[in-house]
């Protein structure tokens, strides 16, 4: 259910804006999106896992907040990120 260390490093490398960047909104949204995808697959199999479902909703809300922040601060970076991640907005 969680992200492996190798996958986390790959995602950070793909979405970082500088060589030492690990906490930019782009990186945080990419990591949350990966966790959301993994948890969604888990919930397809375990439909009655309501504790994990609540965790999923918390993660989706956190990702939404980060995307709203990025949209407010830098529209171009926001558009690039949602295009790369394949998000609907």
UniProtKB/Swiss-Prot annotation:
Alphabetized PROSITE patterns for the sequence: RIBOSOMAL_S15
User: What is a single cellular component term in the Gene Ontology annotation?
Assistant: cytosolic small ribosomal subunit
- Choose any GO biological process term that the UniProt entry carries and state it: translation
Concerning SUPFAM superfamilies, the annotation shows: S15/NS1 RNA-binding domain
CDD domains according to UniProt: Ribosomal_S15p_S13e (cd00353)
Q: Which spans of this chain does the record mark as coiled coil?
A: none
Going by the UniProt record, its keywords in alphabetical order are: Ribonucleoprotein, Ribosomal protein, RNA-binding, rRNA-binding
Q: Which domain of life is it from?
A: Bacteria
S-S bonds: none
Q: Which GO terms describe its molecular function?
A: rRNA binding; structural constituent of ribosome
Listed Pfam families: Ribosomal_S15
**InterPro entries the record matches:** Ribosomal_uS15, Ribosomal_uS15_bac-type, uS15_NS1_RNA-bd_sf
Subunit structure, interactors included: Part of the 30S ribosomal subunit. Forms a bridge to the 50S subunit in the 70S ribosome, contacting the 23S rRNA.
Family the entry assigns? Belongs to the universal ribosomal protein uS15 family.
Reported function: One of the primary rRNA binding proteins, it binds directly to 16S rRNA where it helps nucleate assembly of the platform of the 30S subunit by binding and bridging several RNA helices of the 16S rRNA.
Q: Which NCBIfam families match?
A: S15_bact
Output the HAMAP family linked to this UniProt entry.
Answer: Ribosomal_uS15_B
Please identify the protein, giving its name as recorded.
Small ribosomal subunit protein uS15
Q: What is the lineage of its organism?
A: Bacteria, Pseudomonadati, Pseudomonadota, Alphaproteobacteria, Acetobacterales
């Amino acid at each position: 259910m969680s992200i492996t260390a190798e996958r986390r490093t790959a995602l950070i490398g793909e979405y970082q804006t500088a060589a030492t960047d690990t906490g930019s909104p782009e990186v945080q949204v990419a990591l949350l999106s990966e966790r959301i995808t993994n948890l969604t697959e888990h919930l397809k199999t375990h439909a009655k896992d309501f504790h994990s479902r609540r965790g999923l909703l918390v993660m989706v809300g956190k990702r939404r907040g980060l995307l709203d922040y990025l949209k407010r601060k830098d529209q171009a970076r926001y558009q690039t990120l949602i295009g790369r991640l394949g998000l609907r907005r």
